[in-house]
Curated annotation (Swiss-Prot):
It comes from Mus musculus (Mouse). The keyword DNA repair does not apply. Residues 157-266, 292-403, 439-480, 514-539, 570-631, 665-705 form a coiled coil. One of its GO terms (cellular component) is ciliary basal body. Residues 1-21 are annotated as: Disordered. Keywords: Coiled coil. This is Coiled-coil domain-containing protein 178. InterPro entries: CCDC178 (IPR038826). Transmembrane segments: none annotated. It comes from the Eukaryota.
């Protein structure tokens, strides 16, 4: 129903306002019409409630315990709005409430009009009765009192009852308005939830469209990567098999050659054993000799180490001595430099004192003349000062006057300045208030404009989202249809693949039986070949190991002999050269050592004397310093007191200067001599070190050369004899090996022919094996690819089934969720209907009160008319 719709059955009483005789009839008609309207509205609301309760009987029965009790209805008297057929399409009870308000306002206005009409008619009637009964008896005034009493008694009561009724109606209207606002908020929340649910459904549908193909594609890519890796792994294995076959061929060739050598060695095993025994005897003898030589070498080496340790200890001692001597020399040099500095300072002080004495004499002579001039000037200045004091007093008076005037002007200026700033502050405050108001207005205007823009943008975005959701739903339906078609195609394709897989499995079983038979044959051949190969390998390994060990030992013996001969020759030459050089140098060194010892003693004595002289000089310098200090103090005191003692002090200073000059010259000479002595000492020490090192080296070489030379001569004789015997043996062995080589070559040719024949047979068997193997691997690769494709399809089907199940569960849960939401909403609506019915009952009771009021009112007036 529209908001401002009015009932057509309501009469207008403004036309009959002047007719005073028909007031009671009009009031009766109004009562009847209002009663009919209320009965019609109650019947309609009861029909609505019965229809609603018939649809939801189960829920009403469940909720009747908590909502239909009297206490709950009283507590929720004005808390929920009323709803009618006009509000079923809209979830807000605003139109019904507005209609109720307008209806009550109309009733109130009509009641007021009727009251005014009744008062006017009552006054007219009283005036008419007064005019008619003016000439009657005394009993007439008693009758006139009754209508006035009715007016005074009934009108205030009626007014009070009307006021109470109107206050209740206003309270009801306000409660309905609050309930309407709460219903509006609930409806907004419901709409927002509905939007969120629709957005979630759209997002989930988009996710299904986007993520499912991506997931399937990722799984397909993963399986394709695994297939590629397996293929590459199989290719690597095939390459490794080929490489192993090539290695096998090479090893077979090497084994054939070794077999020939083994046969040859087996035929000549007796000679080889004899040769081995002879070589072992020779090796044992040489090892015994080697051990003896090594023991001698170790003893000599230990002696050499001891001598080297002694030399290093002596060197360390000499270094320590050298360091101590250098420290002492440096300390003496530092002391000498400090003495030189002190002498320089004393000479400077002497010169300063002489100059100061001369200047003081000159100043004293000049000061006597200056004093006379100063006395004259002081007299003139005293006169000038008196004049200046007078002028200063006058100026002070003038300055005080000017200061007083300045203070007066400053006070006036400060008062004017403070007034100006106070006015300025007031103006600034007013301007700031005006600017703040303007800013607040602009901010409010901008906020409202932004809110309007935001609302418009939200409306546009909502419309766009709705259009997009509609489009997406259409696209989703199309894609679901395409997915169903793809599913049908995939099912047909899977059936064909299952048939092909069955055929491939049958072929695979047949080929497998054939390959197993061939593998059994090949295994038997391999066992035969492996037994023969293992026997040959064992024989060849043992013989080769013994031959290699013998060869290694022979080569090691030859190398050691050659190295020992070279070292012996080199040492012999070196020792001969060293002996010749050392004998000449030893004699020279002994003479130089004696001379150096004598010089060292002289230098040590000289140093001792120098140190003593140095100590004496230090003492003299200290004494002179003390004397000079004492004299300087005395001279300062005497210079200030008297002038007569200047000559004595000057003479003493000149004597001290002469002494210091002499001492300074002596110190310079001593420092030069010390430097020369230090240089000579360093040179002698360096020479001593070099000579000592050479002496120790030569002494060591001289001690060991003779023993080594004798030992080497003996070894030389022994080695020459041994070399001569070994040359004979080697010549015999060479002749024997030449004869054996000829026999080996003949046997080698025969064995090569046999190897060629066996290799051809083996190659033919290997080619047959490789052909069968290639056919088997090709079939196996095909089977693997088919198995992988079948497993991929099975996994895809399983994933699709799982997805369908999950989507079914999801939609089932969504249906249950929506059902629960609807149940809650229906329960809330039932509660609201019950509360509306309670409100209607209260309104009907109010209307009945009003009707009772109207009934009572016209009955009294009619009785008076009668």
């Amino acid at each position: 129903m529209p908001e401002n719709e009015k009932e057509p059955a309501q009469p207008t009483t403004n036309e009959d306002a002047l007719d005073t005789g028909k007031t009671c009839l009009q009031i009766k008609e109004l009562k009847d019409k209002e009663r009919a309207l209320m009965l019609a509205e109650n019947a309609r609301m009861q029909g609505l409630s019965e229809f609603f309760f018939s649809r939801h009987e189960d829920k009403r029965l469940y909720e009747s315990k908590s909502t239909n009790t009297e206490d709950v209805n009283k507590a929720i008297y004005f808390s929920y709005p009323s709803r009618r057929h006009s509000c079923t399409l809209v979830n807000i009870p605003k139109p019904c409430v507005n209609k109720m308000i307008s209806h009550i306002e109309d009733v109130e206005s009509k009641i007021q009009e009727h009251l005014t009409q009744f008062e006017a008619s009552f006054e007219e009637w009283t005036s008419v009765t007064k005019d008619k009964e003016a000439g009657l008896d005394v009993s007439a005034p008693e009758k006139q009192v009754h209508p006035e009493k009715g007016k005074d008694e009934k009108c205030p009561e009626l007014k009070k009852r009307m006021e109470t009724l109107l206050s209740e109606a206003i309270h009801l209207i306000k409660s309905l308005e609050t309930d309407r606002a709460e219903a509006e908020q609930a409806l907004k929340q419901h709409k927002s939830r509905k939007k969120k649910i629709s957005m979630k459904i759209d997002s989930w549908s988009i996710w299904k469209l986007q993520e499912l193909p991506l997931a399937v594609q990722k799984e397909h890519e993963n399986f394709s990567k695994i297939n590629a890796e397996l293929r590459s792994y199989l290719e690597d294995i095939a390459l490794k098999v080929e490489q192993l076959q090539e290695r096998k061929e090479k090893l077979e060739k090497a084994n054939a050659k070794l077999q020939v050598d083994i046969d040859y060695m087996a035929s000549h095993s007796v000679l080889l054993e004899k040769k081995r025994k002879q070589e072992l005897g020779c090796l044992k003898e040489r090892y015994h000799k080697k051990f003896e030589v090594m023991e001698k070498f170790r003893a000599i080496h230990e002696e050499l180490k001891e001598s080297v340790d002694k030399c290093e200890g002596a060197k360390a001692r000499l270094k320590n001595m050298k360091v101590e001597n250098e420290r002492e020399i440096q300390e003496e040099l530092i002391n000498a430099t400090s003495y030189e500095k002190e002498l320089d300072k004393l000479s400077v002080l002497d010169a300063h004192y002489t100059t100061s004495i001369e200047t003081v004499n000159l100043d004293i002579e000049g000061d006597e003349e200056a004093m006379n001039e100063v006395l004259r000037e002081t007299q003139s200045t005293t006169n000038e000062l008196e004049n200046l004091k007078k002028t200063v007093d006058d100026l002070k008076r003038l300055f005080d006057q000017y200061c007083w005037r300045q203070r007066k002007y400053e006070n006036e200026y400060l008062e004017a300045f403070s007034n100006f700033y106070s006015l300025k502050k007031t103006w600034d405050i007013e301007l700031s208030n005006v600017s703040k108001d303007a800013k607040d207005l602009t901010i409010v205007y901008e906020a409202q404009s932004e809110e309007n823009k935001r609302i418009q943008s939200e409306i546009q975005s909502i419309t766009d989202d709705i259009e997009e959701s509609i489009k997406k739903t259409a696209e989703m339906e199309e894609e679901v249809h395409t997915f169903v078609e793809m599913k049908m195609k995939n099912n047909n394709y899977l059936k064909q693949l299952y048939k092909q897989a069955y055929q491939v499995g049958a072929v695979y079983h047949l080929s497998r039986h054939k390959t197993e038979e061939l593998e059994d044959k090949l295994a038997d051949l391999k066992r035969i070949f492996k037994g023969r190969e293992e026997l040959l390998k064992k024989l060849t390994r043992g013989d080769i190991a013994t031959g290699i060990e013998i060869q290694k030992r022979l080569y090691a013996i030859e190398e050691t002999q050659f190295i020992e001969m070279q070292e012996f020759i080199r040492r012999q030459v070196l020792y001969n050269m060293a002996l010749l050089e050392v004998e000449e140098q030893l004699k020279e060194l002994e003479a130089e050592a004696v001379r150096i010892r004598y010089l060292h003693r002289q230098h040590s004595k000289m140093l001792h004397n120098i140190r003593k002289r140095k100590e004496r000089v230090k003492k003299n310098v200290d004494a002179t310093k003390k004397k000079l200090l004492k004299k300087s103090k005395k001279s300062r005191m005497e210079l200030t007191r008297t002038e007569g003692k200047r000559s004595i002090i000057h003479e003493e200073i000149e004597i001290a200067r002469g002494q210091t000059v002499a001492l300074h010259e002596k110190c310079i000479e001593l420092s030069k001599e010390i430097r020369i002595m230090n240089l000579e000492r360093t040179n002698y020490e360096e020479r001593l070190k070099k000579l000592q090192e050479e002496f120790f080296k030569l002494q060591f070489d001289r001690e060991h050369v003779h023993g080594v030379y004798d030992h080497l001569m003996r070894e030389k004789q022994y080695c020459e004899e041994r070399i001569f015997e070994e040359e004979r043996r080697f010549r015999r062995l060479i002749d024997m090996r030449k004869n054996t080589l000829k026999n080996i070559r003949k046997c080698q040719d025969d064995l090569l022919e046999e190897n060629l024949r066996l290799a051809k047979e083996y190659q033919s068997a290997q080619l047959i094996f490789l052909k069968e193997k290639e056919s088997y691997f090709n079939g196996y690769d095909r089977l693997l690819s088919l198995n992988f494709s079948l497993s991929d399809k099975k996994k895809l089907c399983q994933l699709q089934k799982r997805l369908d199940q999950k989507w079914q569960e999801y939609f089932r849960l969504m249906i249950l969720f929506n059902k629960t939401k609807l149940a809650k909403f229906q329960g809330d609506s039932q509660n609201s209907i019950q509360k509306i019915l309670a409100v209607q009952e209260e309104s009907s009771s109010l209307m009945q009160h009003i009707l009772d009021f109207f009934k009572s009112f016209p009955n009294s007036s009619c009785g008076e008319d009668d």
